[in-house]
Amino acid sequence: MMFCSFNMRKRNKITYELKNQDLKRSILSVIIGVTKINRWGIMMKDERIGWPAYFMMQAAMLASRSTCTRLHVGAVVVKDGRIIASGYNGSVTGTPHCTEVGDLIVDGHCIRAVHAEQNALMQLAKMGIAAEGAEIYVTDFPCVHCTKFLLQAGIKKINYIRNYNNDEFATSLIQAKGVALQQVPLTATDVAMINFDKYVTENN
């Protein structure tokens, strides 16, 4: 009986210690911002940006290369968690940019520009890579023409940040094809994780 009583006390002590450790971890997670525990049981502060925000930031960075004077758009095509193509809106390679000679507006649209999604898909075509089963991250909701190109190319999911003249027919086509559509907002926390100041090597 004494042996059984000793084992029972030992088990109770271990159970108490484990629960106490869990409580300590919970308290620490609140105090120091710990958000996860790794495979070795070590508490970590998760400072890595999530994949959707990462890919969308890549698209936003590309948008800064745009030569359109009305709207800067960037896009990246992702397959199996890897970027396989990218593009931004601008004039045909080797021809004047809108930033140099102005927009060429016809029926409310600039016909000089090649859209970001189109440039990304054409980059895939030039490299001989299929877009089938990939997803795209684009800064703005695709126009109806780009939507048709994306669907025809086999894109399985369209991710975007901002609504921009969302075309009802484009939305209906996406739904008819069973393609996933998701708005991926970028938060101030996401943006704050990218500290470019530490990479500055020269002061202008």
Please describe what each predicted stretch is.
Residues 1, 22-25:
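Compositionally biased, low-complexity segments
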Residues 7, 12, 20-22, 38:
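Intrinsic-disorder-associated, low-complexity terminal segments enriched in Asp/Asn/His/Tyr and depleted
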Residues 26-204:
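Zinc-dependent deaminase catalytic domain
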